[in-house]
């Protein structure tokens, strides 16, 4: 009996790391997938219903060196040998990762075991792990065309960023949205956006008067979300069919995580982007700039954005269907619908080459 091909997927933390990895896994139904994550992160909720999950206690280095830095470094070193043992015991054939600090022990352990590593970097400016360890990977697939120049010593290939299958098929939206109103979708990403939420609520009356219906995904950490109500305004902590929402939306107001931007591109949704100001190396700002340069989005820095500016930007776009149509078309040029298949093909080719 032929042994199944076993792939270790190292992806942890936010939806931006997890959803592209899940999209890859969906394209490898004949592979045995084992997931590597971190305790108490989003993957402990999303992954176990589909794939066996192994966890290691790693975290990224933050701030100035301290006693905690030593502990983090020790845990990373221990994790390398934990993952190496996992690779050997499970007879893993290859490792795929979407970056973040969990990628480091996975890449090093794979090199120690002499098995291929496939890395997907979704941000325009590569993260530290990509920059440091990308040269150890067989392929570094990138989400933005311009990223290759930051990785001169890596075997890069542009494939866009994989999205979940539902984003590639028409979805029905089970929400009470009047057919004669423009739809604005506001989403703060998996980490929420309380400051932006407050500004959006002050804009709602003007946008509704201009003919809009607003679906506002507030996240779970917004204390004012339960106290605000308005006609043609729906507030939800979370909605599990973002594909349907964005396919229906005339305009999105969003953070600028790479995964979110790819979903906006695939659904051809014009956007107002407010990059998360505390993202590592300000990567969301650089991601958003690509969409601005392409004519697919407007961008505002959170620290200088006022509610009045946001309100006017929304009104200007609502009152210009031609501009929205141009932005939608531009967004569609920034992603590839077949990204997940391309990444799966890279994995398959790497495994075949190594056997």
Swiss-Prot record:
Q: Which GO terms describe its molecular function?
A: glycosyltransferase activity; UDP-N-acetyl-D-glucosamine:N-acetylmuramoyl-L-alanyl-D-glutamyl-meso-2,6-diaminopimelyl-D-alanyl-D-alanine-diphosphoundecaprenol 4-beta-N-acetylglucosaminlytransferase activity; undecaprenyldiphospho-muramoylpentapeptide beta-N-acetylglucosaminyltransferase activity
Gene Ontology terms, cellular component aspect? plasma membrane
Pathway terms, separated by semicolons: Cell wall biogenesis; peptidoglycan biosynthesis
Read off the InterPro entries from this record: GlcNAc_MurG (IPR006009), Glyco_trans_28_C (IPR007235), GlycoTrans_28_N (IPR004276)
Q: What is its EC number?
A: 2.4.1.227
Residues annotated for UDP-N-acetyl-alpha-D-glucosamine binding in this entry: 14-16, 123, 164, 190, 284
Broad class of the protein's primary localization: membrane
Could you say which enzyme class this protein belongs to? transferase
UniProt record, GO biological process: carbohydrate metabolic process; cell division; cell wall organization; lipid glycosylation; peptidoglycan biosynthetic process; regulation of cell shape
Tell me the compartments it is located in.
Cell inner membrane
Q: How does it sit in the membrane?
A: Peripheral membrane protein
Q: Which reaction does it catalyse?
A: di-trans,octa-cis-undecaprenyl diphospho-N-acetyl-alpha-D-muramoyl-L-alanyl-D-glutamyl-meso-2,6-diaminopimeloyl-D-alanyl-D-alanine + UDP-N-acetyl-alpha-D-glucosamine = di-trans,octa-cis-undecaprenyl diphospho-[N-acetyl-alpha-D-glucosaminyl-(1->4)]-N-acetyl-alpha-D-muramoyl-L-alanyl-D-glutamyl-meso-2,6-diaminopimeloyl-D-alanyl-D-alanine + UDP + H(+)
Q: Answer yes or no on keyword Membrane.
A: yes
Which CDD domains does the UniProt entry name for this protein? GT28_MurG
The protein's UniProt keywords, in alphabetical order, are: Cell cycle, Cell division, Cell inner membrane, Cell membrane, Cell shape, Cell wall biogenesis/degradation, Glycosyltransferase, Membrane, Peptidoglycan synthesis, Transferase
Locate the transmembrane regions by residue number: none
| Protein purpose | Cell wall formation. Catalyzes the transfer of a GlcNAc subunit on undecaprenyl-pyrophosphoryl-MurNAc-pentapeptide (lipid intermediate I) to form undecaprenyl-pyrophosphoryl-MurNAc-(pentapeptide)GlcNAc (lipid intermediate II).
Query: Family, per the entry?
Result: Belongs to the glycosyltransferase 28 family. MurG subfamily.
Record protein name field: UDP-N-acetylglucosamine--N-acetylmuramyl-(pentapeptide) pyrophosphoryl-undecaprenol N-acetylglucosamine transferase
